[in-house]
Amino acid sequence: MPRRATRRFLPRKTKHRILKGVIYVRASFRNTIVTVTDTRGQAVSWSSAGACGFKGTKRRSPFAAQTAAANVVDTLVNQGLLKEAEVMISGPGPGRDTALRAIAQSGIQLSYVRDVTPMPHNGCRPPKRRRV
């Protein structure tokens, strides 16, 4: 008689206290995405200006970036999951400063803030300029 394959159903997400994490702020010209990971790089929570209800050109505003950053950080602080964080800011968008300000005002102790915007050392040729 053939043996039946049994599957194990494990919970997908386990709630674990990270206490120390890394907050990545990706500020593009159109949107701002904030991701919180643990020290190993496993994503714990995320938010963006579009996910907070801002649509169209309102997504690129500094207020939308502030709302997205405050949203993701407040959920983790209220659950007691995050006490100390490192902040990595990437991109040239208008919401990078206000997102950092919202993270600093949330009560999380920031160990350091680093700008990791990729800058070419004269690598690839950029695309031609738009003419509108």
Curated annotation (Swiss-Prot):
MF-aspect GO terms: rRNA binding; structural constituent of ribosome
Main location as per UniProt: plastid
Biological process, per Gene Ontology: translation
Gene3D superfamilies: Ribosomal protein S11
Compartmental location: Plastid, Chloroplast
InterPro entries: Ribosomal_uS11 (IPR001971), Ribosomal_uS11_CS (IPR018102), Ribosomal_uS11_sf (IPR036967)
Cysteines paired by S-S bonds: none
Gene Ontology CC terms, in alphabetical order: chloroplast; ribonucleoprotein complex; ribosome
Annotated keywords: Chloroplast, Plastid, Ribonucleoprotein, Ribosomal protein, RNA-binding, rRNA-binding
Coiled coil location: none
Domain of life: Eukaryota
Subunit structure: Part of the 30S ribosomal subunit.
HAMAP family: Ribosomal_uS11 (MF_01310)
Family indicated by similarity: Belongs to the universal ribosomal protein uS11 family.
PANTHER family given in the database record: 40S RIBOSOMAL PROTEIN S14/30S RIBOSOMAL PROTEIN S11
Name this polypeptide is given: Small ribosomal subunit protein uS11c
Originating organism: Cryptomeria japonica (Japanese cedar)
Lineage of producing organism: Eukaryota, Viridiplantae, Streptophyta, Embryophyta, Tracheophyta
